Structures are given as C-alpha cells and as structure tokens.
UniProtKB/Swiss-Prot annotation:
GO molecular function annotations of the record: (3R)-hydroxyacyl-[acyl-carrier-protein] dehydratase activity
Organism expressing this protein natively: Campylobacter curvus (strain 525.92)
Catalytic activity: a (3R)-hydroxyacyl-[ACP] = a (2E)-enoyl-[ACP] + H2O
Protein name: 3-hydroxyacyl-[acyl-carrier-protein] dehydratase FabZ
Name of encoding gene: fabZ
Disulfide cross-links: none
Documented EC number(s): 4.2.1.59
NCBIfam families attached to this UniProt entry: fabZ, PRK00006.1
Length: 148
C-alpha cells in the first residue's frame, strides 16, 4: 500500500490537483489499483455544477493518468528509482474515453489500470474507474517518462 505522503514523493501534483489518495495494489509493469475520495470540499464543485455537483470526466481521466504515473515510476529499475525526482510523466494521448455513470461528492473512485504495452519510456495503459464496483469511466492512455 502506498499512502499520500509516498505518492507526493513520486508525483509532482499537489492540492487541488493531486487526484489519488492511496494505492492499494501495485504489480510493477503489470497493474495498479488506487482510489480517490471525492468530497464536496473540492474547489471544482463551486462551478461544476452549483446545486447539482458532478465530478468532471476530465478529472477522472487525470486521476487515472496519475495512477498510471505511479505505476510507471514504481516499475523503473532500482538504480533509476533515485532519479524519480528528476523525471515527470507526460500525457501523449487519451483514446476510447467513455463516461458511463456520474460521480458525485461522497463517492470513492477506484482506479484500475493495466499495462497494455511498454517500450522504453512509453506506456500504454487500459484505465477504468469504478464506484462501488460499478464501471463509471474508461479510457486508453498513452504516456511518456521524460526528464524535467
């Protein structure tokens, strides 16, 4: 299990844009399971939508991408782990995105990502987001690890 303190050592994101709270399962170069607790206190709900708060789909996809970044960094060889602070993950593409169910304050988003392809510093991931075991969003993500 990886808590938010450890996640912040891996990812450069910070509040309000750090979108994963904990990693519950990780098999390097294979898959990751992480979650985010969605709360009404998040600034995004001031405008999306007043009186009818819905967590934006782009934020769900970004949360998937952040979980994928943790997976990619934790899959680096031991000798490269010390160099994580000098690296960052960039999005290359988002494909096949589908939003199947709205996400509201009080929901716990569970991100499940599997590696479809990995070559060098490029990763292709199948990402899915669930609430209480029900699929709410999915996308295929491509990202690249680069020097800062």
């Amino acid at each position: 299990m990886i808590d938010v303190v450890e996640i912040q050592k891996i990812l450069p994101h910070r509040f309000p844009f750090l979108l994963i709270d904990r990693v519950t399962e990780l098999e390097p170069a294979k898959h990751i399971v992480a979650y985010k607790n969605v709360t009404i206190g998040e600034p995004i709900f001031q405008g999306h939508f007043p009186g009818h708060p819905i967590y934006p789909g782009v934020m769900i996809v970004e949360g998937m991408a952040q979980a994928g970044g943790v997976l990619a960094f934790k899959s680096m060889s031991d000798e490269h782990q010390a160099d994580i602070e000098n690296k960052v993950v960039y999005f290359m593409s988002i494909d096949k995105a589908k939003f199947r169910h709205p996400v509201r304050p009080g929901d716990r988003l569970e991100y499940r990502l599997e590696v479809l392809k990995h070559k060098g510093n490029i990763w292709v991931l199948d990402g899915k987001a669930y609430i209480d075991g029900n699929l709410c969003a999915e996308a295929e993500l491509k990202a690249m690890i680069v020097d800062k």
